[in-house]
């Protein structure tokens, strides 16, 4: 029987069993479950009291079933000693022939058996990997339709004399949402995403219909262009005018409405421009004065930590200090509250710890 066993497991009967020679066969590696479940030959002394002692007799926990290691699913790879002991427990003895057959069958199967995946998961993966042919055909048809509409939009816009910016402003007049020139340009060049192209398509379709039917659409577009230009006009003040405003601010930081009108008339500016400039200048003065006062207070107070550093002993425990010095370790900390001179912390006794390798 020994010739049929694998090299990893060579069955050796427990002490007290029979053998061919005086010393019996050479000892080899034995599965512990086979050793515990072995009863011994008839008439010979067993390895424990009773018939077929199990793991409970030797004080060892019972081995869990193989499927407990896999979360309730059967393990597909070959397991060592599965055929040696029954799954129900380790107390039932097993004949020597059956144990050897179990070892032989498991040792010969070198490659693990593949686990069978659940049918539902395999079906879902297959549906994800294989696209629906009907959906792909619909997407291709929509893409072709968008390409044709983009060409039609560009031709209609150029024929009627609209720019891309005019189209965006007209959409704002018709639907309440203004689109930029870049968006219209990217739509005509098919550079937008498929999702954004589909969202913008119905709005542009309505614009084409309005451009064909409404003759006043271009006049509305021009009026909207003027309104957009008036909304935001950046004010630029010359250096000479800014210097005059600065000198007037030093004389009167908060002028009245009559004074603002007089200043605007002298400098040739609008009243709103002068009023906003004085308001911004006052805010700037408040920020600069507050920063200056905080800096003066900080310099007058001096160092926030008088009295120098204060040393606090660390909590007892292993610390990495200089080797060879067994004194207590201290760390230098700074307290936000100044301590009067003469006061000191009560002495704290810290027992130096020895090396953990040589401790008793």
From Swiss-Prot:
Residues 1-50, 87-118, 287-316 are annotated as: Disordered. It is found in: Cytoplasm; Nucleus. GO terms for cellular component: chromatin; cytoplasm; nucleus. The modification Phosphothreonine is found at residue 235. Disulfide bonds: none annotated. POU5F1/OCT4, SOX2, MYC/c-Myc and KLF4 are the four Yamanaka factors. When combined, these factors are sufficient to reprogram differentiated cells to an embryonic-like state designated iPS (induced pluripotent stem) cells. iPS cells exhibit the morphology and growth properties of ES cells and express ES cell marker genes. InterPro entries: HD, Homeobox_CS, Homeodomain-like_sf, Lambda_DNA-bd_dom_sf, POU, POU_dom, POU_domain_TF. The modification Phosphoserine is found at residues 111, 236, 289-290, 355. Pfam families: Homeodomain (PF00046), Pou (PF00157). One of its GO terms (molecular function) is RNA polymerase II cis-regulatory region sequence-specific DNA binding. DNA binds at residues 157, 164. Residues 180-186, 193-196 are annotated as: DNA-binding. The keyword Plastid does not apply. Its main location: cytoplasm. The POU-specific domain mediates interaction with PKM. Interacts with PKM. Interacts with WWP2. Interacts with UBE2I and ZSCAN10. Interacts with PCGF1. Interacts with ESRRB; recruits ESRRB near the POU5F1-SOX2 element in the NANOG proximal promoter; the interaction is DNA independent. Interacts with ZNF322. Interacts with MAPK8 and MAPK9; the interaction allows MAPK8 and MAPK9 to phosphorylate POU5F1 on Ser-355. Interacts (when phosphorylated on Ser-355) with FBXW8. Interacts with FBXW4. Interacts with SOX2 and SOX15; binds synergistically with either SOX2 or SOX15 to DNA. Interacts with DDX56. Transcription factor that binds to the octamer motif (5'-ATTTGCAT-3'). Forms a trimeric complex with SOX2 or SOX15 on DNA and controls the expression of a number of genes involved in embryonic development such as YES1, FGF4, UTF1 and ZFP206. Critical for early embryogenesis and for embryonic stem cell pluripotency. Belongs to the POU transcription factor family. Class-5 subfamily. This is POU domain, class 5, transcription factor 1. The gene is POU5F1.
